């Protein structure tokens, strides 16, 4: 509404029903039949919105997109979510949440992105018994690989902010819910 151009990126993986993901995209004016990997698709509803199907682990694809778009700011909400799934599929979490996040940080660094906001997780609090949770609580003992990957994101972002002067803000989300939320989450 403020005239900003927005580019959405998603791998549209099958962690849960892809029809839910395509349904969300349809509401933004992006039709499934128009989506091709790494190609920008213009919304038919919003002049300032386009979508790219892209894996964050695809360093070349991320680099090309950042060079082409010259993003002023990045809001990275992408990650392989789910604590239970991380127990049986650890490589997926390392690839998406660590390597993918590194690719975003590097693209921000080399393309002079002015601000990065990213999703961390309440899972970083682990077995902390102090309530309410606080950013001042110790989060050095994750109890799942998912939590460890999100804590790693926080440490990586801190380093890039310090070393390369990229302003970063991490958001420790709790369960996101609603009619378009993940079907494996409780309401």
Regions found by a protein language model. Give the residues of each.
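N-terminal Rossmann-like NAD(P)+-binding domain of SDR-like oxidoreductases, especially those catalyzing
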Residues: 1-176
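Substrate-binding strand-loop-helix patch
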Residues: 179-187
């Amino acid at each position: 509404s403020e005239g900003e151009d927005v580019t959405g990126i998603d791998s549209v993986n099958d962690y849960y029903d892809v029809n839910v993901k395509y349904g969300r995209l349809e509401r933004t004016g992006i039709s499934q039949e128009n989506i091709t990997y790494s190609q920008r698709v213009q919304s038919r509803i919003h002049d300032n919105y386009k979508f790219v199907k892209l894996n964050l682990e695809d360093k070349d694809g991320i680099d090309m997109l950042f060079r082409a778009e010259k993003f002023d700011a990045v809001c990275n909400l992408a990650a392989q979510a789910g604590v239970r799934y991380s127990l049986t599929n650890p490589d997926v979490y390392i690839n998406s949440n660590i390597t993918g996040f590194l690719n975003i940080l590097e693209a921000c660094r080399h393309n002079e992105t002015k601000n990065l906001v990213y999703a961390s997780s309440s899972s970083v609090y682990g077995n902390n018994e102090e309530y309410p949770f606080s950013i001042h609580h110790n989060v050095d003992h994750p109890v799942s690989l998912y939590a460890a990957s999100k804590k790693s994101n926080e440490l990586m972002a801190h380093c890039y902010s310090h070393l390369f002067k990229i302003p970063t803000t991490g958001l420790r989300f709790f369960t996101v819910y609603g009619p378009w939320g993940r079907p494996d989450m409780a309401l």
